[in-house]
Amino acid sequence: MFDVLVYLYETYYRPDACPDSEALVKKLSAVGFEEEEITKALGWLTALAETTNELSDSYPHQTAFSFGTRIYVSQETDVLGTPAVGFIQFLEAAKLINPIQREIVIERALAAGETPISLEKLKVIVLMVLWSQGKEPDGLIFDELFLDDDDAAPRILH
């Protein structure tokens, strides 16, 4: 599923640039993706759109729960794991995602069906949440999303 999501991100600038579902399925099949992978990815994206619409309608000013500390329930920490929770907190503290986007990322990570979800896959989820909203990640988030730990320059701690 994640390979299909990355392919869609790399191929289509915005979600509305994607062809209709039938044509998209044919194109994804033609480039070598399995039907099960395609179905799972497109279902995941449909649920992403539904979650985004629900939260946007419920919190139109995107200020809900923005001043509190997010407490994760055990089901969330089991699925996300400590590195993913830390990464989400980093993104929010750096104002690279807002509280509504954070909740969408968490919901979509829980729906991915992996326990714990890898940091690499969480980064794809963050990217897809931003992509689905037509948001272009700034340079800092782009580096964080695409640099592997092996590729990153060592960080100097003071």
From Swiss-Prot:
Family matches, as Pfam families: DUF494
InterPro entries xrefs: Smg (IPR007456)
Family: Belongs to the Smg family.
Protein name: Protein Smg homolog
Protein's organism: Herminiimonas arsenicoxydans
